[in-house]
């Protein structure tokens, strides 16, 4: 009965594979290009509690016909009335400029207001037009208006599960780099981090 969709994300980004079909497997997400002929099987194992009803809608904005099969599992759970609901949002920026040695640039990836919740993951796809490494920025999480971040990381590459600019795809239960074009870290890169064990409450 929500007035707006609680999940509003392009399909490839929701499944952690965008841009393109990039096979990988983590604890909660999987893309398998071998099972579906010319397409791909995309799997999400996120639990998505709802109280009265749920609706899944997929919009094809490509201009080309797409065949799709959707399978889901559900169960009655009396505890669902007390559970937090699942939300996912998508943000695109194509105007992020480098500071060319003039300091740092903080780029907000998510702002949340209105209600309690848990931050449980992030998927990041980017295009790097140069071979220079893009990921030295530290992730910072400010909770409930705090003046200094309660989470202050050591670098984007550390947040996504590797300690230097790895140019090869990889996947583990909670981290993945599903695409890295190269040479080096030039071109499209797609990363994801699941924070189910270290969720951030707000």
Residue ranges and their predicted role:
Residues 1-202:
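Beta-strand-centric surfaces of beta-sandwich/beta-rich domains
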């Amino acid at each position: 009965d929500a007035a707006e969709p609680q999940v509003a994300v392009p399909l490839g980004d929701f499944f952690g594979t965008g841009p393109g079909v990039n096979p990988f497997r983590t604890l909660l997400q999987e893309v398998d290009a071998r099972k579906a002929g010319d397409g791909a099987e995309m799997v999400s194992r996120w639990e998505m509690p709802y109280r009265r009803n749920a609706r899944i809608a997929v919009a094809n904005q490509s201009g080309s016909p797409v065949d799709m099969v959707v399978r889901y599992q559900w169960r009655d759970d009396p505890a669902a009335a007390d559970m937090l609901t699942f939300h996912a949002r998508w943000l695109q920026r194509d105007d992020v400029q480098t500071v060319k040695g003039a300091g740092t640039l903080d780029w907000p990836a998510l702002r949340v207001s209105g209600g309690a919740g848990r931050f449980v993951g992030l998927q990041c796809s980017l295009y790097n037009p140069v071979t220079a490494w893009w990921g030295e920025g530290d992730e910072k999480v400010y909770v409930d208006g705090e003046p200094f971040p309660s989470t202050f990381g050591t670098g984007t590459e550390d947040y996504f599960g590797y300690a230097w600019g790895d140019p090869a795809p990889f996947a583990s239960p909670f981290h993945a780099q599903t695409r890295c074009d190269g040479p080096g870290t030039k071109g499209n890169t797609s990363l994801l981090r699941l924070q189910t064990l270290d969720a951030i409450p707000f």
